[in-house]
Amino acid sequence: MSVLFQLLIAAFVALSFAMIIGVPVVFSTGDASDDANKLIWGGAAAWVVLLFVAALASIVVI
């Protein structure tokens, strides 16, 4: 279970870095297409899901 928790945290950190870099790049291009908005909202939803899953996993691991 500890390895799964570490993988969840690694995925959370990787997605956070991707969002930190990706969101400003998408907004600075000036292209407000639906695909870009869906990508940003999808990444934000995945970030929130990973946050809650990692929080629940931390309760089980500790």
Swiss-Prot record:
Q: How does it sit in the membrane?
A: Multi-pass membrane protein
Q: Does the keyword Membrane apply?
A: yes
Q: Which UniProt keywords apply?
A: Membrane, Photosynthesis, Photosystem II, Reaction center, Thylakoid, Transmembrane, Transmembrane helix
Domain of life of the organism encoding this protein: Bacteria
One GO-annotated biological process of the protein: photosystem II stabilization
Q: Which GO terms describe its cellular component?
A: photosystem II reaction center; plasma membrane-derived thylakoid membrane
Entry annotated with the keyword Transmembrane = yes
The record ties this protein, via SUPFAM superfamilies, to: PsbZ-like
Localization annotation = Cellular thylakoid membrane
- The parts of the chain that form a coiled coil are none
The record's InterPro entries line, in alphabetical order, gives: PSII_PsbZ, PSII_PsbZ_sf
- List membrane-spanning regions: 8-28, 41-61
What is the documented function of this protein?
May control the interaction of photosystem II (PSII) cores with the light-harvesting antenna, regulates electron flow through the 2 photosystem reaction centers. PSII is a light-driven water plastoquinone oxidoreductase, using light energy to abstract electrons from H(2)O, generating a proton gradient subsequently used for ATP formation.
HAMAP family listed in its UniProt record: PSII_PsbZ (MF_00644)
Outline the subunit composition.
PSII is composed of 1 copy each of membrane proteins PsbA, PsbB, PsbC, PsbD, PsbE, PsbF, PsbH, PsbI, PsbJ, PsbK, PsbL, PsbM, PsbT, PsbX, PsbY, PsbZ, Psb30/Ycf12, peripheral proteins PsbO, CyanoQ (PsbQ), PsbU, PsbV and a large number of cofactors. It forms dimeric complexes.
The entry assigns this protein to a family as follows:
Belongs to the PsbZ family.
Protein name from the UniProt record? Photosystem II reaction center protein Z
Identify the species of origin: Acaryochloris marina (strain MBIC 11017)
